[in-house]
């Protein structure tokens, strides 16, 4: 199964609580940029898992405007910043065993990095800037292979060359 692990877009710092921080205009733009890049890679997403925090759900909205996503996403409390990476990993393994071909996970630091490390033991987790996406291939036996990571900054630098 292909697992695309995405950190939410850039979010405002001023909010009543961490869970209600909205995306900034830049966060919306970066999320759309990454979604359009994924679309150009001919990525097909079968399932979507998202944190219940506002900025993650808004990132999903921006991505959904660009990609053909399933009509509904699974909102998982385990995908919050201090969520349980072991439970998320086990759930991804269950989806793999069910035959799901691809999943987009939208979450937060530090969980996104921990999730790559959990799925790909021995792999140094990449740094996740806002809206960055990592790709991991997860097989039926639970072995994960880190494929790549792309960020809005990488795309902007490539465009400038």
Swiss-Prot record:
Enzyme class: hydrolase
A GO term for molecular function: protein histidine phosphatase activity
Pfam families, sorted: His_Phos_1
Protease is among the record's keywords: no
InterPro entries (UniProt xref): His_Pase_superF_clade-1, His_PPase_superfam, SixA
Entry GO terms, CC: cytoplasm
Annotated keywords: Hydrolase, Protein phosphatase
EC numbers for this chain: 3.1.3.-
One Gene Ontology term from the biological process aspect of the record: regulation of phosphorelay signal transduction system
Keyword flag Hydrolase: yes
NCBIfam families in the cross-refs: sixA
Protein role: Exhibits phosphohistidine phosphatase activity towards the HPt domain of the ArcB sensor involved in the multistep His-Asp phosphorelay.
Family: Belongs to the SixA phosphatase family.
The protein's name in its UniProt record: Phosphohistidine phosphatase SixA
Organism expressing this protein natively: Escherichia coli (strain K12)
């Amino acid at each position: 199964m292909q697992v695309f692990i995405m950190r939410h877009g850039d979010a405002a710092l001023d909010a009543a609580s961490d869970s209600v921080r909205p995306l900034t205009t830049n966060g919306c733009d970066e999320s759309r940029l990454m979604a359009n890049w994924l679309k150009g890679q001919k990525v097909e997403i079968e399932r979507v898992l998202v944190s219940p925090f506002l900025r993650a759900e808004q990132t999903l909205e921006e991505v959904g405007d660009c990609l053909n996503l399933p009509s509904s996403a699974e909102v998982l409390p385990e995908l919050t910043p201090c969520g349980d990476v072991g439970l998320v990993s086990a759930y991804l393994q269950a989806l793999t065993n069910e035959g799901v071909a691809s999943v987009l996970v939208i979450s937060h630091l530090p969980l996104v990095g921990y999730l790559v490390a959990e799925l790909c033991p021995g792999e140094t987790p990449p740094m996740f800037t806002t809206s960055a996406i990592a790709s991991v291939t997860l097989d039926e036996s639970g072995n994960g292979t880190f494929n790549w990571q792309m960020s809005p900054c990488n795309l902007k630098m490539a465009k400038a060359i």
